[in-house]
From Swiss-Prot:
The family this protein is said to belong to: Belongs to the RecA family.
Organism encoding this protein: Neisseria flavescens
Residue sites binding ATP per the record: 43-50
Gene it is expressed from: recA
GO biological process: DNA recombination; DNA repair; SOS response
Protein known as: Protein RecA
Length: 274
C-alpha cells in the first residue's frame, strides 16, 4: 500500500506501555515502551531484566491490555509475578521446546492482533531444533543468528500492522581477544540490534541493606538505542526482593534531582515536612 502522510492515515501520537519505573519512562523520552516496535532489554545475570518486563506487563494489564510471556528459559515464577502486580490468570504463558517453536508462537500471537504485549525470555534460550536433536559437542555455527534474522524479517511487518509491543530479553556474552572497546556482546547475532527500536542495558550497581540483611538491588538502566526519542539517557532505581521496583524511593530520588524535595544528610523534606 502507498499513502500520503497528511495525518489521515498516520496517528501522530505514539502509543506506549509504561515500564512501571518512572525514571525509565522519562529516560525513554516518550513515557514508556513504544507499541508497534521491537524492544531489546539486555544485561548480566540477576540484573532485573525479567523483573522490568513483568512490571511492564502489570502496567499493560492495569490498562486492560492482554499480554503473553514466551518462557524459553523455563524459569517463570508465577508467585513472584503475582507479587509484582501481574494478573497471572490473565497472562498467556508458553514454554516452547525449540527456538523455532517459540518464534512461531510469537508470530502467531502478533498476527492475531488480539495481544498488546509479547515478552520473549530470552533470546539466548532460543535453541535451534537442529541443535536440540543433535549430539552434545556438535558444532552449529550461526544457526541461532540465522533463526533470529529470519524471524525478525517476518515479524516486523506484523508487529507494526497490529501495533503490538514485542520485548526480547537478552543475555550478555564476552568476545574473545578484544583489545580495545567493550568485549561484551549480546547473543543471537546482529539482526536484533538493527530491528530493535529501543535497546535497554540494565545493570545491578549495588546492594540495599537493612542492617546486615540484603533486601534489594540498586539498578541502573541505560537507553543504548532509541529510534523514537534521543538515546543515551539513564535511570536509576531500586529493586526490592519480593516487591519489585521501589516506586516511592524512585519518586523521592527524582524529587531531589529536580529540587522539589530537599535532602539534608539522611533526611528528606518536602515543603518543610520531613
Amino acid at each position: 500500500s502507498i499513502m500520503k502522510m497528511d495525518g489521515s492515515q498516520q496517528e501522530e501520537n505514539l502509543d506506549v506501555i509504561s515500564t512501571g519505573s518512572l525514571g525509565v519512562d522519562l529516560a525513554l523520552g516518550v513515557g514508556g515502551l513504544p507499541r508497534g516496535r521491537v524492544v531489546e532489554i539486555f544485561g548480566p545475570e540477576s540484573s532485573g531484566k525479567t523483573t522490568l518486563c513483568l512490571e511492564a506487563i502489570a502496567q499493560c494489564q492495569k490498562n486492560g491490555g492482554i499480554c503473553a510471556f514466551i518462557d524459553a528459559e523455563h524459569a517463570f515464577d508465577p508467585i513472584y509475578a503475582r507479587k509484582l502486580g501481574v494478573k497471572v490468570e490473565e497472562l498467556y504463558l508458553s514454554q516452547p521446546d525449540t527456538g523455532e517453536q517459540a518464534l512461531e508462537i510469537c508470530d502467531t500471537l502478533v498476527r492475531s492482533g488480539g495481544i498488546d504485549m509479547v515478552v520473549v525470555d530470552s533470546v539466548a534460550a532460543l535453541v535451534p531444533k537442529a541443535e536440540i536433536e543433535g549430539e552434545m559437542g556438535d558444532s552449529h555455527v550461526g544457526l541461532q543468528a540465522r533463526l533470529m534474522s529470519q524471524a525478525l524479517r517476518k515479524l516486523t511487518g506484523h508487529i507494526k500492522r497490529t501495533n503490538t509491543l514485542v520485548v526480547f530479553i537478552n543475555q550478555i556474552r564476552m568476545k574473545i581477544g578484544v583489545m580495545f572497546g567493550s568485549p561484551e556482546t549480546t547473543t543471537g547475532g546482529n539482526a536484533l540490534k538493527f530491528y530493535a527500536s529501543v535497546r535497554l542495558d540494565i545493570r545491578r550497581t549495588g546492594q540495599i541493606k537493612k542492617g546486615d540483611d540484603v533486601i534489594g538491588n540498586e539498578t541502573k538502566v541505560k537507553v543504548i538505542k532509541n529510534k523514537v526519542a534521543p538515546p543515551f539517557r539513564q535511570a536509576e532505581f531500586d529493586i526490592l526482593y519480593g516487591e519489585g521496583i521501589s516506586w516511592e524511593g524512585e519518586l523521592i530520588d527524582l524529587g531531589v534531582k529536580h529540587d522539589i524535595v530537599e535532602k539534608s544528610g539522611a533526611w528528606y523534606s518536602y515543603n518543610g515536612a520531613k
